[in-house]
């Protein structure tokens, strides 16, 4: 489990889908990240940024980049997922 100040995060695989469990002071949130078929590697935490009542968790899994923004005052969550382009060369 990864923790910092008021937010603890754990990554789990349930029924083929990666989830983030976010534990804040008085609540827990289960956040679906993506399927293990498209995201075969366990997501790993790249960075954690605290700024003005928010925590931003940046994760990666292969070509996937995920940003979880936690608004500490309200307990609301925003998830942004980006898939990087493939670097494999293909003959045309």
From Swiss-Prot:
Task: State any GO BP term from the record.
Answer: viral process
Record has DNA repair as a keyword: no
Transmembrane annotation, as ranges: none
Q: Which InterPro entries match?
A: Bunya_NSs
Q: Which UniProt keywords are listed?
A: Eukaryotic host gene expression shutoff by virus, Eukaryotic host transcription shutoff by virus, Host gene expression shutoff by virus, Host-virus interaction, Inhibition of eukaryotic host transcription initiation by virus
Signal peptide annotation = none
Checking Pfam families in the record gives:
Bunya_NS-S
User: Is DNA damage among this UniProt entry's keywords?
Assistant: no
Q: What does this protein do?
A: Inhibits host transcriptional machinery, by producing modifications to the phosphorylation state of the C-terminal domain (CTD) of RNA polymerase II. Inhibits phosphorylation at serine 2 in the heptapeptide repeat (YSPTSPS) of the CTD of RNA polymerase II, suggesting that the elongation step of transcription and/or 3'-end processing is prevented. Inhibition of host transcription machinery leads to shut off of host cell protein synthesis and inhibition of the host innate immune response. NSs also seems to be involved in the nuclear relocalization of host PABP1.
Q: Into which family does the record put it?
A: Belongs to the orthobunyavirus NS-S protein family.
Question: What's the protein here called?
Answer: Non-structural protein NS-S
Give the species this sequence originates from. Answer: Bunyavirus snowshoe hare
